[in-house]
Every structure is written in C-alpha cells, then in structure tokens.
C-alpha cells in the first residue's frame, strides 16, 4: 500500500472517554489544511503502552508523517515517548543538555524539580528535540524507519501551538512537500443552513483549484477555500475570483472571514459607526455579554448588561411595568420591547438588545413551548421585535447559544443597513 499524507494520533484516556474535548486535533487539522498537506486520519488512544505501540506501527504502514499529542509529562501515565521507542525497538538515551534545560525552566517558574521530571530528558536514539518554550515537556522529530517521521507534542494546547508555530510548521514546509504557494480562506455564514447554502453555491463545490468545502456548526456554516499556485500571488489570484463569486451569491449571510467571530464583527461595526450597545438577558443568563466581552477592546463600544432573570429584576433595573408582565408574561414581545427600551434609557446607549425565552427542558406551555425565545433590538429609529422557535429537542445550551447568534446577527444587519 502506498503511503500518503499526515495522520494525527492523540494520546489520553481523558480524550478517549470524552472527559475532555479534543481541541488539539481540530486545531492541528486546520493548520495542516492551511499548509496544503493531505490529512486522512485521526486516532485517539488511551494511556496504554501496548495499544499506543500498535497504533503507531499501523500508522507507519499508512502515512509518511505522524503527529502525536499528549503523554509527554513526568507522571506514570505519560507513556508516549517510551512507547514510541519500544514500538521500533529503539533504546532511550538521556540528553544531559535537555535535563539541564528542564531543571532551569522549573526553577525559573518557582516549581520544585522532582525526580520524575528527569524522564522528560530521555528520547529515542536518533531523535531530534522539538523545543517547548512554554513548558517542561519537550517533543521530538524522529524518523524510526524509512519514509516515516513522528512529531510529538505535549497535550497542553498553548504549549502544543507554540511548538507548532515556532518549529514544527517551518520543518513541515521544508521537509513534508507542502506546496510552495498555498492560500486558504474561511468564509463564515449565519442565518442560513448548510443545505440552503449548498443550493446557492452547489456548482462551485466541485471546483478543483480552489477547492470549496462546507462545514456546519450550531447556527454557523463555514466554507473553506483552498488554492495552490507557483507563487503566493498566483495562489491568491486563483482564490480571489471564487471568493467573489461566493459572496455575490450569498450576500448578507456571510459575516466574516478566517478568525472572525460574529461578536467581533458586530463590535467592529459598532466602532466604525461610533455607537454603543447594552444587553438585557433572561434565558441566556449572560451568554450574550460573555460573547461580547470575550473580544479584546469590547469596552470601547459595549456599555454593559443586565441579567434580568426574575420579574422583580426586570421591573427594578429595566423599568418593565408590572402590569405588562402580568398581562403578557416574561416571555413575550411587549416585555422584551420594554426591556430593550428601558436598557437604552438607563445605559444611554445607541442600541439595546433584550432576550427572554423558555430554554428548557421544563417550563414550556402550549402557547409558549420550550425553545421559544422573544428578542428585541431597540435603536434610535425604533425597536425590532421577533420570535424564534428553536424547538425542545435541541436542548437548553443550544437554545441559549442560538439566541445569542440570532440577536447579534440582527444587529449586524441593522448596522450594515445604516452604513
């Protein structure tokens, strides 16, 4: 069987059991795609030497490059380096200079140097060190047999990413056959489902260069465009017309590119308009405010928020009349309108968003079922009111996340319309 591409092997029982989401594999897969390196398989193995050895031997027969994460620490369940060496009958050797470096890092960080840390200074004979500038667990670049190279990384995401950028990515560009010129771009869409988006751009999904691939997440669809060429300029020239075609067909549904988030885009538009925003949340419990404040510099346009979970707080902090609550209930368009307008009045902001709904799993009625959310966007020219019915089967967290997305997207569209 001809060997092709790159595989990812993630080590850790916590990953295998689902206790921790495997964010490292996702991040690495995106970076490999950005490099134009074919990546065909991901494997997760628990902290077990025999199974780890078997997985590595199998990979050696399929791929040219294996990237591993996890299992490089000093504890008994950190088995990766020793298991890899055993899989290819290669002795481990201590690297004195590596041991000195590990001790220096631990001491500089005010941490005691344990005898177990010394195990991190042992690598298979013939392996090169993959430096870790942020932690004590070095990785390695090792070719234990012809046409097969292993790159090992710790499982700590910040350390793994730093090592990738500083050392691994340059090595891959030089040694792994990455295209000399490769451009990748991600276009992000909301307010449209994957199937509806595919209907609009379906004929473009068959393109060979650039390729166009859709990926769906909760409330969001991404199109990844990848183009190659003999030079960076030529690769960009191949990609640009496709990007323009996609944007012409999809228009307002595309909210950003690459690392853009919907919250960041909204905040940027607010900044460009010189306007401010405040939020009043009931069923989302602060999720909208959290999404906004996760963006650095948000304080320039985000005035603040109120988590008005109870009717009393809606009355006291937002000025919602008790009679309105009695007549319509907290989950109603009149109440969210009063919340949003009261918010604008008290925060002296340009825009006010209010959300109130039945996130579930209980609390629904025939008139107001689980998954029903009322939203309001108040501005200088009036108040938009709308109801979203997300359904009970999605679950509480999904209802909350989708409510945040719909609120932000409505504000995005209003800001674009006024510019």
UniProtKB/Swiss-Prot annotation:
Name of the featured protein: CinA-like protein
InterPro entries: CinA (IPR050101), CinA-like_C (IPR036653), CinA_C (IPR008136), CinA_KH (IPR041424), Competence-induced_CinA (IPR008135), MoaB/Mog-like_dom_sf (IPR036425), MoaB/Mog_dom (IPR001453)
Homology family: Belongs to the CinA family.
Gene3D superfamilies reported for this sequence: 3.30.70.2860, CinA-like, MoaB/Mog-like domain
NCBIfam families on file: cinA_nterm, PncC_domain, PRK00549.1
UniProt cross-references to SMART domains, sorted A to Z: MoCF_biosynth
Top-rank taxon, per record: Bacteria
């Amino acid at each position: 069987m001809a060997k092709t591409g790159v595989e990812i092997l993630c080590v850790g029982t916590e990953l295998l059991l689902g206790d921790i989401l495997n964010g490292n594999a996702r991040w690495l897969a995106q970076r490999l795609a950005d490099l134009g390196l074919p990546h065909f398989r991901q494997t997760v193995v628990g902290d077990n030497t025999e199974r780890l050895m078997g997985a590595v031997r199998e990979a050696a027969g399929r791929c040219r490059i294996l990237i591993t994460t996890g299992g490089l620490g000093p504890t008994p369940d950190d088995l990766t380096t020793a298991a890899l060496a055993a899989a290819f009958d290669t002795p481990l050797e201590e690297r004195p200079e590596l041991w000195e470096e590990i001790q220096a890092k631990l001491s500089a960080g005010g941490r005691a140097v344990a005898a177990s840390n010394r195990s991190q200074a042992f690598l298979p004979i013939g392996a090169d060190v993959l430096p870790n500038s942020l932690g004590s667990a070095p990785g390695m670049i090792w070719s234990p047999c012809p046409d097969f190279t292993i790159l090992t990384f710790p499982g700590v995401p910040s350390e793994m990413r730093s090592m990738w950028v500083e050392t691994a990515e340059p090595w891959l560009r030089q040694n792994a056959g990455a295209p000399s010129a490769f451009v990748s771009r991600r276009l992000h869409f909301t307010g449209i489902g994957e199937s509806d988006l595919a209907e609009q751009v379906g004929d473009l999904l068959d393109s060979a260069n650039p390729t166009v691939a859709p990926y769906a997440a909760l409330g969001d669809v991404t199109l990844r465009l990848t183009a190659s060429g003999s030079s960076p300029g030529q690769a960009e020239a191949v990609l640009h017309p496709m990007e323009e075609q996609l944007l012409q067909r999809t228009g307002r549904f595309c909210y950003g590119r690459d690392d853009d988030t919907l919250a960041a885009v909204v905040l940027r538009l607010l900044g460009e308009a010189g306007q401010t925003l405040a939020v009043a949340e009931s069923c989302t419990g602060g999720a909208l405010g959290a999404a906004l404040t996760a963006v650095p510099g948000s304080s320039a346009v985000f005035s603040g928020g109120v988590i008005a979970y109870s009717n009393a707080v809606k009355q006291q902090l937002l000025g919602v009349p008790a009679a309105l609550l009695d007549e319509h209930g907290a989950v109603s368009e009149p109440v969210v309108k009063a919340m949003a307008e009261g918010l604008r009045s008290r925060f002296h902001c340009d825009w006010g968003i209010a959300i109130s709904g039945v996130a579930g799993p209980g609390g629904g009625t025939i008139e107001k079922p689980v998954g029903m959310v009322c939203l309001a966007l108040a501005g200088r020219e009036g108040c938009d009111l709308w109801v979203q019915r997300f359904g009970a089967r999605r679950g509480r967290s999904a209802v909350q996340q989708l409510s945040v997305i719909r609120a932000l997207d409505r504000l995005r569209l209003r800001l674009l319309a006024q510019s």
